């Protein structure tokens, strides 16, 4: 399918097929009903329009649920430009509906890396060549691009150093091109940039690393570590969407299979329970003794990945780290083993080394590839090692994404409202807002809260209306 680059009023966009807009609009309407928290925030602030005229760039999976987030930001007054944060995660009917509504969106399923970073550049380029005042990021690619461009203008030689991957080379080539056209583009952009809210674990790691190195340029809100994000999206979202992605891609019977979950953080916990719930015999690999003990106490076998080779049928990486499954591991896997990733980036599996190896690649269907080694054994790689739940299915359900996106919207409101007082650093949303996000979702699922009496509140030393837990409390 060719992409469509067109104009609607003054909003340039690039999507796969604009004729899918009506289908997308129908699904957006259904999704709104399943996203009570986000819709409540929209109703609360739509008249006030606290983001009036604010230029927002989003880099986040262009799904039906994200469309509801985008239109919430627009209803709050923002001028929004959007790209997806993954080459396979766009739902083309969602992108078409948003483009038809007049929002500049640059996203389609199956982008090349060159196209992906071109889309990201378009998303940060607002009318008149201006940059974003706020950023909604997922994985930190917009934040990375702006910071690397800024450092290049300050004399950094990073763009001329050897690249560790094809994607890194693509980024460097793009930055060189931009620098040749406008040697001060990123400095002009940063002058008006007021903050970023980051969606996922991997992007948060990038933010903290930049902060430690003294390179972070703006205040950043770590949305990922809001309890109503990490303990819901990462855990319950993955519990439903991982199995969905594997089943849609392969139609394999999960029951009775040996599944190896690499990592037992919140995403790993959700993934392990996802496959155990379908009858798989689940093994967990971990580096952290606390997480390893948790997995063992849940009844999972915990061992090294090397000990699973030859008996694992399904491998899932969810660590946020690199080179978890190596080429050597894949050569030793059981014939027809399924290998996939539900961490943000594709470097958890050594995809570059696999593609450069002597293994022969055969595409079974989009996002499902069989690699056959010279000895005759084969493995299946799903979504080219990228997010399997979004590459091979439609990601998390709307209800759980309402939690995450309510947090994103509140973070954007907070960054703009307090733009003159925030200092450069990484922050989390206050506990009271975290509890409010949860509260907005209770009625939808029939929950009735118990109310503290004044005496009980005094006994606990908390307000009757909350917040009820200290910041260090582990849910």
UniProtKB/Swiss-Prot annotation:
**What are its E.C. numbers?**
3.13.2.1
Q: Keywords of this protein's UniProt record, alphabetized?
A: Cytoplasm, Hydrolase, NAD, One-carbon metabolism
Names of the cofactor(s): NAD(+)
Q: Where does NAD(+) bind?
A: 200-202, 234, 263-268, 286, 321, 342-344, 389
> Which Gene3D superfamilies does the record cross-reference, listed alphabetically?
Adenosylhomocysteinase-like, NAD(P)-binding Rossmann-like Domain
Q: Pathway, per Swiss-Prot/TrEMBL? A: Amino-acid biosynthesis; L-homocysteine biosynthesis; L-homocysteine from S-adenosyl-L-homocysteine: step 1/1
Catalysed transformations (reactions): S-adenosyl-L-homocysteine + H2O = L-homocysteine + adenosine
Which compartments is it annotated to reside in?
Answer: Cytoplasm
Record's cofactor remark: Binds 1 NAD(+) per subunit.
A single MF term (Gene Ontology): adenosylhomocysteinase activity
Coiled coil location: none
- Kindly list the biological process annotations in GO that this record carries: L-homocysteine biosynthetic process; one-carbon metabolic process; S-adenosylmethionine cycle
Write one Pfam family the protein is assigned to: AdoHcyase_NAD
Residues that bind substrate: 63, 138, 199, 229, 233
Question: Domain of life of the organism in this record?
Answer: Bacteria
Q: Record's GO cellular component, any one?
A: cytosol
Q: Which PROSITE patterns match?
A: ADOHCYASE_1, ADOHCYASE_2
Name the family: Belongs to the adenosylhomocysteinase family.
Q: What is the stated purpose of this protein?
A: May play a key role in the regulation of the intracellular concentration of adenosylhomocysteine.
State what protein this is by name.
Adenosylhomocysteinase
- Species assigned in the record: Solibacter usitatus (strain Ellin6076)
Per the record, the gene is ahcY
């Amino acid at each position: 399918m060719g992409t469509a680059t067109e104009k609607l009023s003054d909003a340039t966009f690039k999507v796969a097929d604009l004729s899918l807009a009506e289908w997308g609009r129908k699904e957006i309407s259904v999704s709104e009903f399943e996203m009570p928290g986000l819709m409540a925030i929209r109703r609360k602030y739509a008249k006030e329009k606290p983001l009036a005229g604010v230029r927002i760039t989003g880099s986040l999976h262009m799904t039906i649920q994200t469309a509801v987030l985008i239109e919430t930001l627009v209803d709050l007054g923002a001028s929004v430009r959007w790209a997806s944060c993954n080459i396979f995660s766009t739902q083309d009917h969602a992108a078409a509906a948003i483009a038809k509504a007049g929002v500049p969106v640059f996203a389609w399923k199956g982008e090349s890396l060159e196209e992906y970073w071109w889309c990201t550049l378009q998303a940060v380029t607002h009318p008149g060549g201006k940059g974003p005042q706020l950023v909604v990021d997922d994985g930190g690619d917009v934040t990375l691009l702006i910071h690397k461009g800024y450092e290049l203008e300050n004399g950094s030689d990073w763009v001329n150093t050897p690249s560790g991957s094809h994607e890194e080379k693509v980024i460097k080539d793009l930055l060189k091109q931009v620098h040749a056209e406008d040697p001060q583009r990123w400095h002009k952009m940063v002058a008006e940039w007021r903050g970023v809210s980051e969606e996922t674990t991997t992007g948060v790691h990038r933010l903290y690393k930049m902060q430690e190195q003294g390179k972070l340029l703006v205040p950043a809100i770590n949305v990922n570590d809001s309890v109503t994000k990490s303990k819901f999206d990462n855990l319950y979202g993955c519990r439903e969407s991982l199995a969905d992605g594997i089943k849609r891609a392969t139609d394999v019977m999960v029951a009775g299979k040996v599944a190896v979950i690499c990592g037992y953080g919140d995403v790993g916990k959700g993934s392990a329970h996802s496959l155990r719930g379908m009858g798989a015999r689940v093994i967990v690999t971990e580096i952290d003794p606390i997480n390893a003990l948790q997995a063992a106490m849940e009844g999972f076998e915990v061992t090294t990945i090397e000990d699973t080779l030859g008996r694992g049928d399904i491998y899932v990486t969810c660590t946020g780290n690199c080179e978890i499954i190596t080429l050597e591991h894949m050569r030793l896997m059981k014939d027809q083993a399924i290998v996939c990733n539900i961490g943000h980036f594709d470097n958890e599996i050594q995809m570059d080394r696999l593609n450069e190896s002597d293994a022969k690649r055969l595409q079974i269907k989009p996002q499902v590839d069989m690699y056959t080694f010279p000895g005759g054994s084969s493995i299946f790689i799903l979504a080219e090692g990228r997010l399997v739940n979004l590459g091979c299915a439609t990601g998390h359900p709307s209800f759980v994404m309402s939690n995450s996106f309510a947090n994103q919207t509140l973070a954007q409101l907070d960054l703009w409202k307090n733009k003159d007082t925030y200092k450069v650093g990484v922050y989390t949303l206050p506990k009271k807002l975290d509890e409010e996000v949860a509260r907005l979702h209770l009625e939808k699922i029939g929950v009735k809260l118990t109310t503290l009496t004044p005496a009980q509140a005094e006994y606990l030393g908390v307000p009757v209306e909350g917040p009820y837990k200290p910041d260090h409390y582990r849910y």
